[in-house]
Amino acid sequence: AAADRLHAWWAGDGSALNDSDKLFSKQLPGTDFEKSVWAAARRVQPGSCASYGDIAGVIGVPRGAQAVGNALRRNPVLLMTPCHRVLPASALEAAKRAKRLGGKPYEAVGGFSGAMTGPLTDLKRHMLIWEAERFGSAEPALF
């Protein structure tokens, strides 16, 4: 089931992972807060992005951006819960500005899976670019 969805997503079906929470939500380890963050992150569509603060607002903790980042760092299923689509507000604004000016979006992406630099953040950047090219809008937008 999960493998089939990943294959469909890789083949270009941007909606293949939309309801992945049905596969995992009750089985995932984590606190209720972490699970609410992961559920909100799953609502961010391919080719779109949200900020940590956006996710915090959606789950009812408007000043909880840092806690959202910490919860995403503990995400146990990286592609099925697309935490790579969640960026610091400054990186989201920089990506929007770069797109308007014809530059490269996603030069700054924040952390990924606990790393702030290096191969994991490079992977996050490449996933964002790949999804924007594959599934449409490179314009960062919430949900």
Predicted regions, residues:
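Basic nucleic-acid-binding alpha-helical/helix-turn surface characteristic of O6-alkylguanine DNA
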Residues: 1-63, 106, 122-143
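Short glycine/serine-rich loop segments
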Residues: 63-119
